[in-house]
Curated annotation (Swiss-Prot):
Keyword hit for DNA repair: yes
Primary location recorded for the protein, binned into one broad class: mitochondrion
Record organism: Candida parapsilosis (strain CDC 317 / ATCC MYA-4646) (Yeast)
BP-aspect Gene Ontology terms: interstrand cross-link repair; mitochondrial genome maintenance; recombinational repair
Region described as Disordered: 37-68
GO molecular function: double-stranded DNA binding; single-stranded DNA binding
Subunit structure: Forms homooligomers in vitro.
GO cellular component, one term: mitochondrial chromosome
Entry's localization field: Mitochondrion matrix, Mitochondrion nucleoid
Biased composition (Polar residues): 37-47, 57-68
Similarity remark: Belongs to the MGM101 family.
Transmembrane segments: none
Name of the protein described by the UniProt record: Mitochondrial genome maintenance protein MGM101
Function as written in the Swiss-Prot or TrEMBL entry: Plays a role in the replication of the mitochondrial genome and the maintenance of its telomeres. Able to catalyze strand annealing and D-loop formation. Binds a wide variety of DNA substrates. Exhibited the highest affinity for DNA molecules carrying 3' ssDNA overhangs (Y-form, 3' FLAP, 3' overhang) and for substrates with complex structures (X-O and Fork). Forms homogeneous ring-shaped structures at the ssDNA native telomeres ends.
Length: 266
């Protein structure tokens, strides 16, 4: 009787200890949804900058101006605005400012240079009949009127690049005043290696458009002057493409005896 009691006594601790050991190894799993709810209640919500931008469209960075092309310049004008008043530190952000625009006219001496008639021999004509003044002529007139260093062309936006064209907005500054704003554009062909040259053409186009507000070479926008100048100095001739043999009409100066390749005069 005593022996059986011992057996029962020995078995009882084993039976009692076994569930305890197995319970210590058991880890209760918490559902993922419940865990997320508990975490959100205990810890403050942390929102990343990307999530904030998604929630508020106004905080999103503007889409790159080169969204239709596979490359970009990333040449947006730097932020030069200061917390202080611009009149205190003489710091003007020309990418955003209209300082001096239309404030007062230039002197009579400068106006006479800007409004002087252009020479007939300085005008050129494109094959499609468009008259133009070479860019260097505009720069010489500006240098004569304001002096070298007295004027400048500043970019006001990032370059907009597409698969076949580049454009950018520029502002013409003369004697510390904004004079004119224009967007230049230039077509290009041949891939990315042609974009840099096209950007210079875009700048030249913007300079020409800004100079129009100063009255430089204003005759080139006068239909009467255009008709008279064409009749006196130009002629329209039939030409043939040397490769595909297509025929068309092109304009040229009477002083130019030859048609440029790939055309030949009929």
């Amino acid at each position: 009787m005593l022996h059986s009691t011992k057996l029962v006594f020995r078995a009882t601790p084993q039976a009692l200890c076994f569930p305890v050991r197995s319970y210590s190894r058991y880890v209760r799993t918490v559902p993922k949804t419940a865990s997320a709810k508990t975490t959100s209640k205990l810890a403050p919500s942390i929102t990343t900058e990307d999530e904030v931008a998604e929630q508020d469209p106004s905080l999103q960075e503007p889409q790159s101006a080169t969204s239709t092309a596979s490359f970009a310049f990333h040449d947006a004008p730097p932020e030069t605005r200061s917390v202080l008043n611009s009149s205190t530190n003489n710091n003007i952000d020309w990418s955003d400012s209209y300082h001096g625009l239309g404030s007062q006219p230039f002197s009579r001496e400068i106006a006479d240079i800007l409004l002087a008639p252009i020479k007939d021999q300085d005008i050129e004509i494109k094959p499609d009949g468009l008259l133009y003044l070479p860019e260097i002529k505009y720069r010489r007139i500006l240098n004569k009127a304001f002096g070298p260093g007295g004027w400048g062309l500043v970019p006001r936006t990032e370059s907009l690049i597409t698969k076949s064209q580049i454009s950018r907005e520029y502002g013409l500054i003369c004697h510390g005043r904004l004079i004119s704003i224009a967007r230049g554009e230039q077509d290009y062909f041949g891939g990315e290696e042609k974009v840099t040259t096209a950007l210079e053409g875009c700048k030249s186009n913007a300079l020409m458009r800004c100079c129009k507000d100063l009255g430089i070479a204003s005759e080139l926008w006068d239909p009467g002057f255009i008709r008279k100048w064409k009749a006196k100095y130009c002629e329209e001739v039939f030409v043939e493409h040397v490769v595909n043999k297509k025929k068309k009409k092109l304009w040229k100066l009477k002083s130019n005896k030859k048609i440029e390749y790939p055309y030949k005069q009929l």
